[in-house]
Amino acid sequence: MFFLPLFDDNPTGRWPLVTWALMAACIIVFFIQVSMTELQQIALWFEYGAVPAVIMGSASLPPSLEGLPPALTLISYVFLHGGWLHIAGNMLFLWIFGDNVEDRMGTIRFIIFYLICGAAASLSHVLISPNSTAPLIGASGAIAGVMAAYLLMFPRAKVRVIMVILIFIRWVHLPAFVVLISWLLLQIFAAPSSLSVEGGTAYFAHLGGFIAGLVLTPIFRKAGTPIWPKAETPPSWQIEPVPARQVKTEFIERYRRKKRVMVPQVKRDAPSQDKSNNPNNPWR
């Protein structure tokens, strides 16, 4: 069985400008990458990716590579990606979960939170594989922190997922905590296998970013935002499959930005001399 989240049923109260800016930055950098030759891309990954051995000081880049100071690559790596599926998956998860977290943190706090989670993810990877010379790239670790924040603040939000069971495809609603905890368990079970492989998926970076998100969310959330809020109404998660056309309609409604309704101000004139003699005049 396999399932992939597509969008949530959790509208926001503001434009997610930081989320969009982060997505735009990653996409722009990726298109710059694909315009390069393969050797140029690899050089870029070593210059701006987080290379554990270089960060720990046990190795150094060749003189021909002029990258950032090693400490800065703990953050710069989040804007690099290794392929179309890599960036598509990361941007999908940031699109789904980032806007709500930004809404509950605010613009400045959200971007600081995102970058700290990214740095925590790369540090986790460096500490687990200090002698690795493979560059760490991708926004997965930072987005894992965003997913942790979503789990704490919106555990019961409905997430529309596409579920594949053998040859059958179903569109169902699942609670956010089921989707996110399932993802977390997958990272935990897969992490040990990455210890014996140079390169590949950096599962410990994902776990490090997620843990950072759990720790930082209570600090970065807006005042009054509850952690794991109690359900005010009975859950209405839809387990029964629905047709694809309904999913399309739900998606459009979820991200449609309705015009703000302006409430007209009622101007009340001061009572005139003639009105003052009227017994029904409220100003009398």
Question: Which residues fall in each region the model found?
Answer:
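A detector for small-residue-rich transmembrane helices and their helix-helix packing motifs
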Residues: M1-P271, N278-P282
